[in-house]
């Protein structure tokens, strides 16, 4: 599993952080232990280690580079990944056909920029988790729960 985070705000957008935590080896040498309480300090260290013009592995399994949202989505699409964008007008996640190796795209509390959202519609299937508004962390938990249910039934 990988987590992609994009930071599009000032002072120097867009930063792409890719996280593919290393699970084997000794903590502190081959890998880092990432607890919920450590997330902000780890992200701060990763952002600090950014160097213009290079994709840099800051910790084992944690990279940072300058890359925009549409560029990343395009790369994932070209690799054959199935992209899903969360949209209140999308198909309900409970009935949607979620294909193997999915990537879910969600914005912050403001949503995605309208221009990027329009372009992403051509690459992504639009899905919704329901009629209510949730925090991003809740959305991630709901999507993971739905994927777990499908995996348990052999549907993924």
What label would you give each PLM region?
Residues 1-85:
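RNA substrate-binding interface of SAM-dependent RNA methyltransferases
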Residues 10, 90, 110:
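Short, glycine/serine-rich, charged loops/turns that create anion-binding
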Residues 75-81, 97-101, 122:
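Flexible, charged surface loops at secondary-structure boundaries
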Residues 82-88, 104-107:
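Short, hydrophobic beta-strand segments that form beta-sheet elements in well-ordered domains
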Residues 88-90, 94-101, 144-149, 153:
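Catalytic cores of processing enzymes, dominated by hydrolases/peptidases
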Residues 93-108, 114-117:
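Strongly charged, low-complexity linkers/loops
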Residues 106-111, 128-132:
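Glycine-centered small-residue hotspots that permit tight backbone geometry or close packing
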Residues 116-156:
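Structured adenosyl-cofactor binding patch, chiefly the S-adenosyl-L-methionine
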């Amino acid at each position: 599993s990988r987590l992609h985070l994009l930071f599009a705000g000032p002072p120097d957008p867009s930063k792409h952080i890719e996280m593919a935590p290393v699970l084997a080896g000794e903590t502190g040498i081959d890998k880092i232990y990432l607890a919920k309480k450590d997330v902000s300090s780890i992200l701060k260290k990763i952002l600090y280690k950014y160097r213009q013009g290079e994709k840099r592995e800051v910790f084992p399994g944690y990279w940072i580079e300058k890359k925009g949202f549409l560029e990343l989505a395009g790369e994932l699409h070209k690799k054959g990944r199935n992209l899903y964008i969360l949209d209140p007008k999308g198909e309900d996640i409970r009935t949607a056909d979620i294909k193997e190796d999915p990537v879910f795209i969600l914005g912050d509390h403001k949503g995605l920029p309208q221009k990027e959202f329009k372009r992403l519609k051509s690459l992504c299937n639009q899905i919704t988790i329901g009629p209510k508004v949730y925090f991003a962390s809740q959305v991630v938990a709901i999507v993971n729960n739905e994927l777990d249910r499908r995996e348990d039934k052999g549907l993924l």
